[in-house]
Amino acid sequence: MEKEPKDKGDQYLIYTDILAIFKLASDIQWKEVRQNSVYRILYLSSVLYSFRHPEKSNPFSIYKFTVDTTGPYDSNISKAFDFLIKDEYIKRTTGDDVFAIGKNSSNDVFKIEIGQERYEWLKQVMYILGIYGENKIYDFIFRDPQYQTTIKSNTQQGLNTDINNETIKTLKNFQEAFEETLKDQKEKLSPQTYLELYFEYIFSKILKRED
């Protein structure tokens, strides 16, 4: 069973995370975003955070994702969508699952209220995904190590997004293997660069139709 947010502050963060995604989507020329894509973007933001910021607690741990037929799911995100639609922060466009920024959204809520650091992390994730397009997000999710581990376990447990999740372990192994080839140059690469290289690697598997 999924947990409710601990307090209204957590629910407010969910609202602003969603609105930030729509703002960032507009910045990368995605005029519309599917609701399922928002679940997937927030899952990737959660599961990858501790690789990029291992010294910090994960601010996206407010999300409690389970595996649904369409990918990661959190009922609190669904409830947030209902609220944001009702108050016209977002609006339906070409279908029941497709949305765009509504008439009540303003730039202030996207960056100031969400917090600069949280916003910048969402921006990094969105800009990486923007290279490949919204239609490829599910392919990245399907090949996500933690997502695959949870599916194969065939249990009702949620998706683990803490610092010991399978995705972080895979990224660390990827980094170590890459550093072996770099030798003395390894200090020149940042965690963000490794993250981008990892997405390139996964995308190559998508093109080859490999798991």
Task: Identify what each model region corresponds to.
Residues 1-211:
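Domain-edge interaction signal
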